Every structure is written in structure tokens, then in C-alpha cells.
């Protein structure tokens, strides 16, 4: 088996990509945070301490943690990768011909470590040491960004997701996140950990306009036994799911994709904010969104080129059939109606399973964590008072690249 393989949501987690977004978070302000898809400004120092605790918790469980900025820095050691990234981020059409050339020359003066930090964390006009014959530069406020920060890279789950023996480099729904995909394309194409490995790649063409076919990894659950569960959400479209399904079937990486319809609401922007897999038959669920009667479709291959798409009447039955189970143990968000809504908002259902029955979760969600404990789920608590304000929990902040099947 290729070691770059994610066979389930609950098998032993062996290797994962995280991101510690120091520079990007320091560029968040009350003025720009909403454009950058954050609801609020985080305390950088506290958020980084919480992220360090998350890393340590995983490492204490034997998980190999790779940091995105380190991977990008190492990728930039390859001249072809550096040229490719700068070409796609600093174009004449974005900045004008003279200004683009001068920005590119300025960036090339930096070390790979500094360049990786800038690409991920942003660059303001005031940081440029030159004045170009550029109307764009002359018209811009000094504190506007030449290169926008990417604080959402914190949520490494979304930009790329490994599905059995392949990786989907996702066409993101929001403009503020589209640049993230090219960082992962470069890493998977040129970083030594990946460049000599044989694995399927989906949505890899950086020159293709994917139009309405968007998909984000928070909506993708690799539930095992050749099945993939995907949420139709505000970020993931039916077109994106069908295109992903076709590529998975073409490369023989899945036998069925199950799609379920979510409300288009920020509180449940991805499937994993309302449902995660914790043990063989155990799921964490926010019951106001996930129920057996929700819209559900089974997608299977139909010959070499087509899909068979069937609407299914009972989501829970579809899930049990896919996983070859006789029953499901559904743990709903804890507390009364008010407490459950508050805890779902703070990612009580967004847990990262380390191995069957062992999960990482925010400690603040006491009512839900108590229900997990009573159901026999061992919770490894982490602080998320700041990180959680970005609207993502432990699963959102992790991209497994090596995990056992079931």
C-alpha cells in the first residue's frame, strides 16, 4: 500500500499537515477580517499557543505532524517550483507589467523561509522598498495588501483532502481562498516527500476554470470501505461532487459517493461542522441539521464515462449499508437547545479521530464532551478559545495524508 493513503475517518492517524498561521493572523483587522472570511480578530499570541498545544497533543499520540509553512519553504528550494508559484501569483494582469516584474524581483531577494512566510501571510504596499511607475501602487493605501494574507490556510482540511490513494486539490468556493490551492499543487508536485510518489491527483490543472464545480475538504468524509460521504453546502456544489466522483471512479479509488444536502448557512458551512465519525458505528451529529430524512443521493459509476445518481429515502440506512453495519450510535450535541446551539457554533461536532474511539476536541464544549465520555469515546481536550473563533475545530485544522483503513 502507498504510504500516502487515507483509508477512513477513524483508522490510526499516522501523518498530518497542519498550519501555524502567525503572519496571516497578525494581518487580520476589524476592517478586513470579513473579506478574509473571519468573523473576528483573534489574539495572535493565544491562538499560536493553542495551536502549539494541538500539535503536541497529536505528537503525544504518535502522529507525525508536518507544518505547511515548512513544506512550502522546502518546496521553494526547487527553482522550477519557485518560478511556477511566482508566475501564478505575481502576474502582469494582476499588477501591470512593470510593477509585476519589480515585485517578483523583490521577492526573489528573500530567503525561501521569508518567501514562504510572505506567500502565506501577506505583504503590504508599505513593505515595498521601491516606487514603481505603477498607477496601482500610486493609488493604493500603504496598508493595503500587495499579496493578501491567507489566514484560512489554518484549516488545512479544506484546500486539499486525501481520499484513499489520491488527493483532491480543491477548487475553492471563495476568492479569499483560491490562492491556497496553488500552494498545495506546488507542494504535491515538487516537494521530495510527494514528488517521487505515485498517487492520483484530482482538480490539479491550475489553468482550468472550474466555474461552479467547487469543493472543500471540510465537506468530504472518507468513511471507509470504498465509500465517500460529501456534503452539498455553501462551499461545495453538486457539480463539484459529480466531477470528484467521476475522477474517483476513473482512478478506482472509490466505489460510491454519498451526497447529503446541508443548509447554506455559516454555522454549518461544511459537513464536518455538524457530523464527524468517531468509532466504527459512532458518529457525532448536530440533530438540527443531520437526520435520516435529509436529502441524500447515492452516486456510483455507470460504465466508463457516466454516473448513476439515485435519490435515497433514508440517509441512516444508506450509511449503515455502506459501512456494513447493523446499527449506528448517534451522539448528538450536548446540553439543552441553547447550549447545543452554542456548542455546535464552537465546533463541538468537529472532532479529529486519532484512532477508533479516541478524538481531539475543544475542551470548552463541556456538555457534548460529557456525552462523548459516557458513550465510551476518549476525548483529548485542547484549548480553542481563540482558534475556535475562526469557525473550525480539530478536524478542520488538519489534513491527514496517512491514515489506516477500517
From Swiss-Prot:
GO process terms (BP): arginine catabolic process to ornithine; arginine deiminase pathway
Enzyme kind, highest EC tier: hydrolase
A cellular component annotation (GO) from this entry: cytoplasm
Cross-referenced Pfam families: ADI
Gene3D superfamilies (UniProt xref): Arginine deiminase (1.10.3930.10), L-arginine/glycine Amidinotransferase, Chain A (3.75.10.10)
Catalysis: reaction(s): L-arginine + H2O = L-citrulline + NH4(+)
Localization: Cytoplasm
InterPro entries documented for this protein: Arg_deiminase
Primary subcellular site in the record, as a coarse category: cytoplasm
Pathway terms, separated by semicolons: Amino-acid degradation; L-arginine degradation via ADI pathway; carbamoyl phosphate from L-arginine: step 1/2
GO molecular-function terms, A-Z: arginine deiminase activity
Keywords (A to Z) from UniProt: Arginine metabolism, Cytoplasm, Hydrolase
EC numbers, comma separated: 3.5.3.6
Active site (catalytic residues): 396 (amidino-cysteine intermediate)
Similarity annotation: Belongs to the arginine deiminase family.
Cited PANTHER family: ARGININE DEIMINASE
Protein name (database record): Arginine deiminase
Primary gene name: arcA
